[in-house]
Amino acid sequence: MYLHLGNNVLVRKNSIIGIFDMDTATWSKRTRDTLSMVEQAGQMENAAGSELPKSLVICSLGSGQRYILSQLSPATLLRRSRSTGLENL
């Protein structure tokens, strides 16, 4: 099964490591530094388009990780994941 993150971006539900709220996740300097490093390395995907991202989804990708910004709120993504059978988030 897949979870739709917005703007035609889909991820496999079993690859999701976590869904984080961008409002609270960026309070920590350590988190901001990590996100900056990921973005500078070109590993950040923007599914939010021109809208302000509301959530960050981290997925496993082979031996690495995939970081995706979404314009959908974490609550919406969680509701969608549960309706598709992703109960462990």
Descriptions of predicted regions:
Residues 1-89:
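Eukaryotic intrinsically disordered, low-complexity regulatory linkers and tails enriched in Ser/Thr/Pro
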